[in-house]
Amino acid sequence: MGDNITSITEFLLLGFPVGPRIQMLLFGLFSLFYVFTLLGNGTILGLISLDSRLHAPMYFFLSHLAVVDIAYACNTVPRMLVNLLHPAKPISFAGRMMQTFLFSTFAVTECLLLVVMSYDLYVAICHPLRYLAIMTWRVCITLAVTSWTTGVLLSLIHLVLLLPLPFCRPQKIYHFFCEILAVLKLACADTHINENMVLAGAISGLVGPLSTIVVSYMCILCAILQIQSREVQRKAFCTCFSHLCVIGLFYGTAIIMYVGPRYGNPKEQKKYLLLFHSLFNPMLNPLICSLRNSEVKNTLKRVLGVERAL
């Protein structure tokens, strides 16, 4: 047994059990989505950096969300594309651990950033006269750093619990990336502590932040209904709708994965939900939350106009 435990240093990601033609089709589609993700979020980062009119708390947090979305895609998609072309290409033990750690880090960070963005919107709509006094740059930087730091620290806990586990079972991971629960199934030791920590982290990451978001939006809705100007009211509703779409995509997939009903093959369901979460969410977020914003669109038009003139 000891020899088996120490001999496994590489693992195979089985990905999608489809034929070669479907694999090539998926490779083309996922490559296209990956490019759109990098292009959309990269555009948001570039526009916010270039235009001083976008140097405001709202766009500061949007830029961090764009960074998380790029990181999400870069952590999972390149390896997934390699596996579609070369299904037998293994991933190293260190690579597996790093991918698991980074995915958890980005998930927790995005969860907290969505809470911070909801709070920023709450202050902007419910306390507009005090907005600049409350959302100072010091507060904004503190909130962003706290989100990233919490994501790293919570993921380190999972990593510390995962590293000592021996792996002596067949080194095949039935997933398109090293998702922590899929990795735990390969361990030949008791993993109840690890699984309970993952469950506790998922529940606390859903219930606490989502409750805060719901309370924030209830206050926001009450404040919007009291606005006299129809134009201001419409603009506030549009901003809230964009944010709620992003929140719905993130928390919707997470809730279905962890607390939703199971039909058919739960493992396959979870795998495809995680695909949506790590590939489609990052691609859709800039379209929903940023590129529909009038100030961002105006900046994009100005940049494109300058490029055409040159």
From Swiss-Prot:
Gene Ontology terms for molecular function: G protein-coupled receptor activity; odorant binding; olfactory receptor activity
An annotated GO cellular component: membrane
Topological domains annotated Extracellular: 1-24, 79-99, 158-194, 259-271
PROSITE patterns noted in UniProt: G_PROTEIN_RECEP_F1_2 (PS50262)
Cytoplasmic side of membrane: 49-56, 120-138, 219-235, 292-310
Keyword Cell membrane: yes
Subcellular localization(s) per the UniProt record: Cell membrane
Membrane topology: Multi-pass membrane protein
Residues carrying sugar: 4
TM stretches of this protein: 25-48, 57-78, 100-119, 139-157, 195-218, 236-258, 272-291
Keywords: Cell membrane, G-protein coupled receptor, Glycoprotein, Membrane, Olfaction, Receptor, Sensory transduction, Transducer, Transmembrane, Transmembrane helix
Disulfide pairings: none
Predominant place of localization: membrane
InterPro entries reported for this sequence: GPCR_Rhodpsn (IPR000276), GPCR_Rhodpsn_7TM (IPR017452), Olfact_rcpt (IPR000725)
GO biological process: detection of chemical stimulus involved in sensory perception of smell
Entry's family note: Belongs to the G-protein coupled receptor 1 family.
Known function: Odorant receptor.
Name assigned to this protein: Olfactory receptor 2A7
Organism of origin: Homo sapiens (Human)
Gene: OR2A7
